[in-house]
């Protein structure tokens, strides 16, 4: 039985499962939470939950649904290079940037009082 949820986090939709690591772009509400490691967060923007054969959809979000997670640390993504060139003009520009991201682990998915966690034995 695979349990997963689709959440809306920072303008992106992520498919999350309990016990797995994910990277999310660092946005303003995350920046205040990163002062300490293992900061616990609760995400209420849950679009869909699947548990076994049951699937629940929200319009746009599910009521009484949340995803509990811990922010482990912040880091930077690999460098993205941008190269602009005008043909036949000898004009070239090369620059890049590194996007700041936060790594988090999903502890549990909750829906209507039920808690779905990992089934590690």
UniProtKB/Swiss-Prot annotation:
TM stretches of this protein: none
Entry GO MF terms: rRNA binding; structural constituent of ribosome
GO BP terms: translation
Domain of life from the UniProt record: Eukaryota
Record bears the keyword RNA-binding: yes
GO cellular component: chloroplast; ribonucleoprotein complex; ribosome
Predominant cellular place of this UniProt entry's protein: plastid
Keywords (A to Z) from UniProt: Chloroplast, Plastid, Ribonucleoprotein, Ribosomal protein, RNA-binding, rRNA-binding
Annotated compartments: Plastid, Chloroplast
Protein family (similarity comment): Belongs to the bacterial ribosomal protein bL21 family.
Summary of subunit composition and partner proteins: Part of the 50S ribosomal subunit.
Job of this protein: This protein binds to 23S rRNA.
Database matches in NCBIfam families: L21 (TIGR00061)
Name the UniProt record assigns to this protein: Large ribosomal subunit protein bL21c
Natural source organism: Chaetosphaeridium globosum
Lineage: Eukaryota, Viridiplantae, Streptophyta, Coleochaetophyceae, Coleochaetales
